[in-house]
Amino acid sequence: MIFPMQQLIEFQGNIYEITCAATRRAFQLAAVCDPVLDELGGKVVSAAAQQVFSGTVDYRIEPQELG
């Protein structure tokens, strides 16, 4: 599975934020050996990015405590 570049180009949000979300999701998929990886030939980052950009997986920014 190749991530559709057009979807990335048209993204209007914070690209750093969604990249961090996709990275975290890739870690989660790899850690639990999610069955979706078998369907996609083991492409963890592509699977995670597709899930985050398509809205299959929601993410939120947690407030950081200072001090």
From Swiss-Prot:
Record-level GO cellular component terms: DNA-directed RNA polymerase complex
InterPro entries, A to Z: Pol_omega/Rpo6/RPB6, RPB6/omega-like_sf
Keyword Transferase recorded: yes
Protein name as it appears in the record: DNA-directed RNA polymerase subunit omega
Function of the protein: Promotes RNA polymerase assembly. Latches the N- and C-terminal regions of the beta' subunit thereby facilitating its interaction with the beta and alpha subunits.
EC numbers for this chain: 2.7.7.6
Nucleotidyltransferase is among the record's keywords: yes
Subunit structure: The RNAP catalytic core consists of 2 alpha, 1 beta, 1 beta' and 1 omega subunit. When a sigma factor is associated with the core the holoenzyme is formed, which can initiate transcription.
GO BP term, example: DNA-templated transcription
Catalysed reactions listed for this entry: RNA(n) + a ribonucleoside 5'-triphosphate = RNA(n+1) + diphosphate
UniProt GO molecular function: DNA binding; DNA-directed RNA polymerase activity
Keyword annotations of the record: DNA-directed RNA polymerase, Nucleotidyltransferase, Transcription, Transferase
Record-stated family: Belongs to the RNA polymerase subunit omega family.
